[in-house]
């Protein structure tokens, strides 16, 4: 038995297919979902979702949102999402490097909003690079 998985962003449906397993970045840690999972509603953090439609895994960068699981249906509503196989790694590396520099600079700032935005941008850039298949150690 398999799951029906849908990843829906405001501007597009990123994934709509059957899957055997899903791993999501919840706000309290990684969340694994298999067929027969108990009903669930959970907040999602910025991070990488992994979905296994067969024997291979597909990575999707999620920009935060919510997941609802019920009767082997997994509906993921997100602020933004991007499949890892569509991400330009060079561009993602460059974006992460710039986000890291901005984060380092913001740590000296008194402006809480600036620090928050720098942290958010860093997490998003890191998730995109990880979803592309690159190992990120920062």
UniProtKB/Swiss-Prot annotation:
Tree of life domain = Bacteria
Q: Which UniProt keywords apply?
A: ATP synthesis, CF(1), Hydrogen ion transport, Ion transport, Membrane, Thylakoid, Transport
Q: How does it sit in the membrane?
A: Peripheral membrane protein
Task: Supply the SUPFAM superfamilies for this chain.
Answer: Epsilon subunit of F1F0-ATP synthase N-terminal domain (SSF51344)
An example molecular function term from Gene Ontology annotations? ATP binding
Chain segments carrying region Disordered? 88-119
> Where is the protein found, in the record's own terms?
Cellular thylakoid membrane
Sequence ranges of Basic and acidic residues compositional bias: 109-119
* Record note on quaternary structure: F-type ATPases have 2 components, CF(1) - the catalytic core - and CF(0) - the membrane proton channel. CF(1) has five subunits: alpha(3), beta(3), gamma(1), delta(1), epsilon(1). CF(0) has three main subunits: a, b and c.
Q: What does this protein do?
A: Produces ATP from ADP in the presence of a proton gradient across the membrane.
Q: So what family is this one in?
A: Belongs to the ATPase epsilon chain family.
User: What is this protein's name?
Assistant: ATP synthase epsilon chain
Q: What is the lineage of its organism?
A: Bacteria, Bacillati, Cyanobacteriota, Cyanophyceae, Acaryochloridales
């Amino acid at each position: 038995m398999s799951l029906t998985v849908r990843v829906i962003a405001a501007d597009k449906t990123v994934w709509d297919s059957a899957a055997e397993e899903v791993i999501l970045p919840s706000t309290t840690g990684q969340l694994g979902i298999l067929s027969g999972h108990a009903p669930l509603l959970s907040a999602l953090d910025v991070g990488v979702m992994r979905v296994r439609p067969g024997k291979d895994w597909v990575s999707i960068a999620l920009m935060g949102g919510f997941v609802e699981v019920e009767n082997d249906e997994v509906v993921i509503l997100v602020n933004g999402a991007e499949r890892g196989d569509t991400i330009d790694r060079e561009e993602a590396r460059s974006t992460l490097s710039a986000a890291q520099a901005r984060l380092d600079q913001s740590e000296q700032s008194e402006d809480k909003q600036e620090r928050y935005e720098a942290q958010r941008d860093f997490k998003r850039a890191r998730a995109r690079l990880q979803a592309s298949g690159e190992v990120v150690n920062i």
